[in-house]
Amino acid sequence: MRMTRLSSEFKSILFDLDMTIVDSSSLLSLRKRRKWNLVYNQFHQTRVYGELKVILKRLSQSYRTGIVTSSPKKYASRLITYHDLDIDILSAYHDTRRHKPDPDPILNAISIIESKPDECIYIGDEVNDIIASKRAGVKSAGASWGSESIIQINSANPDFLLDTPDDLIKLFL
């Protein structure tokens, strides 16, 4: 996909956490069974995709950044801390009554970050991320390296399709 620099169009960049920033696939079975103490002890099995840790740090110098996740806040906060991710805000499962694909989690993040929908973009790896973005009135970018195939993500018609985390540099820096 051809990338056009969007640096002046957005003030805030929001991300999904699991399988967009962090490959947490090794924790899925434990998370489904709600074995949280075991999950926290297995963070060493997770990894940040590509150079996303460095990219997030660079993005945070020019944009407000945040994570919008369907994961519990305690888990998300600990995972963010474990990987030392440079973000401004977190909107997690317990922060809203309704969850993606409902727009409430993204709208909550926009409120916390003191922005407006037309000043934000949301980056996620699932169709529900793209649907939630559209419902919240924000631009969307599908991360093709996550849990759903590029065909699945593309079926939701994201505004942008990212092949690798490095595409974020092309778009925003």
Language model: regions and residue ranges:
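Active-site neighborhood of HAD-like aspartate-dependent phosphohydrolases
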Residues: 1-48
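Glycine-rich phosphate-binding loop signature in dinucleotide/nucleotide-binding domains
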Residues: 6-8, 61-63, 113-119
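Conserved Lys-Pro-Asp/Glu-containing loop-to-beta segment of HAD-superfamily phosphomonoesterases
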Residues: 12, 103-130
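Conserved phosphate-coupling serine/threonine residues in phosphotransfer and NTP-handling enzymes
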Residues: 20, 69-71
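Short, acidic loop-to-helix structural element flanking the phosphoryl-transfer center
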Residues: 40-67, 77, 81, 103
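Surface-exposed amphipathic alpha-helices with a cationic face
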Residues: 53-61, 110, 130-134
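A short, structured active-site edge motif that brings together acidic residues
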Residues: 86-100
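Acidic, Mg2+-coordinating phosphoryl-transfer loop and its flanking beta/alpha structural elements
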Residues: 121-161
